[in-house]
UniProtKB/Swiss-Prot annotation:
Organism: Paraburkholderia phymatum (strain DSM 17167 / CIP 108236 / LMG 21445 / STM815) (Burkholderia phymatum)
Protein name as catalogued: NADH-quinone oxidoreductase subunit B
Subunit structure: NDH-1 is composed of 14 different subunits. Subunits NuoB, C, D, E, F, and G constitute the peripheral sector of the complex.
Topology with respect to the bilayer: Peripheral membrane protein
Main EC class the enzyme belongs to: translocase
Protein keywords: 4Fe-4S, Cell inner membrane, Cell membrane, Iron, Iron-sulfur, Membrane, Metal-binding, NAD, Quinone, Translocase, Transport, Ubiquinone
Function: NDH-1 shuttles electrons from NADH, via FMN and iron-sulfur (Fe-S) centers, to quinones in the respiratory chain. Couples the redox reaction to proton translocation (for every two electrons transferred, four hydrogen ions are translocated across the cytoplasmic membrane), and thus conserves the redox energy in a proton gradient.
Length: 159
């Protein structure tokens, strides 16, 4: 957290936006939407070697308890309404990480009649993680990029 000033009396001054965003970056609770082989790498990122828990990322089983959705894998046309329904059940503010070539743009199955050519056609995506499949390190980097994006956003609406 960048603190604008520390006074000699022991007070710390900052804005409410920066304080709220700093607390949000330390408690991201993702809802996993694993559709293909990228989900295996997502499990690696949550395991002991990479340990997303150290960033405050704790996987949740319910969309009502989540504020981040990680879409990992090929999204077909029949699964798209379910993806949107799960996204709509998440509380605000909510963010989406698109993980892998298939989730980003259809990947290997881009020209198939049954594949959505990117989950950004169904839900707004905040961070794209490239690769086929992307490594666990790439997902950790994507989470760090999402934390940086959250720190930059304005939380309190200004007139």
């Amino acid at each position: 957290m960048s603190i604008e000033g520390v006074l000699k009396e022991g007070f710390v001054t900052t804005t409410a936006d920066k304080l709220i965003n700093w607390t949000r970056t330390g408690s991201l609770w993702p809802m996993t939407f694993g559709l293909a082989c990228c989900a295996v790498e997502m499990m690696h990122a949550g395991a002991a070697r990479y340990d997303l828990d150290r960033f405050g990322v704790v996987f949740r089983p319910s969309p009502r308890q989540s504020d981040v959705m990680i879409v990992a894998g090929t999204l077909c046309n029949k699964m798209a309404p379910a993806l949107r329904k799960v996204y709509d059940q998440m509380a605000e503010p909510r963010w989406v990480i698109s993980m892998g070539s298939c989730a980003n743009g259809g990947g290997y199955y881009h020209y198939s009649y049954s594949v959505v050519r990117g989950c950004d056609r169904i839900v707004p995506v905040d961070v794209y993680v490239p690769g086929c499949p992307p490594t666990a390190e790439a997902l950790v980097y994507g989470v760090i990029q999402l934390q940086a994006k959250i720190r930059r956003t304005n939380t309190i609406a200004r007139q």
